[in-house]
């Protein structure tokens, strides 16, 4: 059996941004996951670069955790936002995010996404603090505006993060996120047993 290693391609296909639409009520802060439907033929990881732009200065725009953050005005209407996506090799494309601001926007429940604790997250005292909101979703708002609650004696909620202690057995911490409309979603933090964690070598 002969095994060969293919050389890395010398050409790079630029990413392709796909249009996005977000609908939300006036005055909200939304976090649009615009990269979720963008494509890269080479399979390169995509990220946002620069600050998104809008011809209407009624929106305040920024980027957080590869999401387009927009503080919406009280004025209803359609707002067009442009953002730049880049791959890991310098290819770029400009995408369009349309934000429909309307008081008639139906409330959407947030979505909690499970978190799995890794050895790098565990502190020297055997505790772990998991920023659970970082991978949660709120289609008509921002996940970082959600309220976190957990009814588990083995865990504490601190600054909207879940703090737990590594034990002899794996366990799950069920938590709930609640948005400004009172709608909820749930997910779990998977806390591994001490024996499941690989030893960490400090440099």
Cite the ranges covered by each PLM segment:
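Extracellular interdomain linkers/hinges and stalk-like, low-complexity segments
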Residues: 1-43, 80-84, 88-142, 146, ...
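Short secondary-structure boundary micro-motifs
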Residues: 5-7, 53-55, 67-68
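Aromatic-enriched hydrophobic runs in primary sequence
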Residues: 54, 59-61, 91-95, 154-157, ...
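Strand-loop-strand motifs at the edges of beta-sheets in extracellular beta-sandwich domains
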Residues: 57-72, 152-172
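Charged, amphipathic alpha-helical scaffolding segments
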Residues: 72-78, 84, 166
């Amino acid at each position: 059996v002969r095994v060969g290693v293919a050389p890395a391609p010398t050409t790079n296909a630029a990413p392709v941004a796909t249009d996005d639409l977000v609908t939300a009520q006036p005055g909200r802060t939304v976090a649009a996951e615009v990269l979720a439907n963008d494509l890269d033929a080479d399979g390169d990881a995509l990220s946002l670069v620069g600050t998104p732009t809008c011809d209407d200065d009624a929106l305040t725009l920024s980027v957080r955790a590869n999401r387009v953050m927009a503080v919406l005005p009280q004025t209803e209407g359609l707002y067009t936002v442009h953002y730049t996506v880049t791959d890991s090799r310098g290819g770029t494309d400009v995408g369009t995010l349309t934000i429909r601001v309307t008081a008639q926007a139906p409330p959407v429940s947030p979505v909690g996404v499970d978190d799995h604790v890794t050895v790098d997250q565990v502190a020297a005292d055997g505790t772990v603090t998991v920023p659970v909101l970082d991978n949660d979703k709120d289609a008509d708002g921002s996940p970082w505006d959600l309220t976190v609650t957990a009814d588990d004696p083995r865990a504490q909620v601190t600054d909207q993060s879940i703090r737990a202690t590594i034990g002899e057995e794996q366990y799950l911490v069920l938590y709930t996120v609640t948005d400004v409309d009172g709608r909820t979603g749930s997910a779990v933090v998977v806390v591994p047993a001490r024996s499941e964690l690989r030893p960490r070598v400090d440099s």
